[in-house]
Amino acid sequence: MIEFKLQSQCFLHHWNNYPEERGLLFTVNNNASDSYQGAVMKAMGVVAGVSDMVYLHPSGAMLLEFKTPKGRQNDRQVWWQGQVEKAGYRYIIIRSFDDFTALLDR
């Protein structure tokens, strides 16, 4: 499964099964369509490497990165994960639908 399909499957599962939490799991749109848009987004605060989604779970914020089983983080993603964890937040790499549902069951 490719990353965007996994992310979509997980989001829809959460949306449909946890209606009381709607809006607490959301995507971070940090992909510019061209260099001009990229410059505008950077000036507005877009940071390279941020996680794919933010989950404002009742037990605390979690930053979720979706990767295929063989997918690897790039250098900026590794750096950002370190920043997140130093600040005391949870950064979780989701590699399967089962990883995601296990997270919800915590």
Region annotations inferred by a language model:
Residues 1-106:
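Catalytic phosphate/metal-binding cores of nucleic-acid and nucleotide-processing enzymes, i.e., regions
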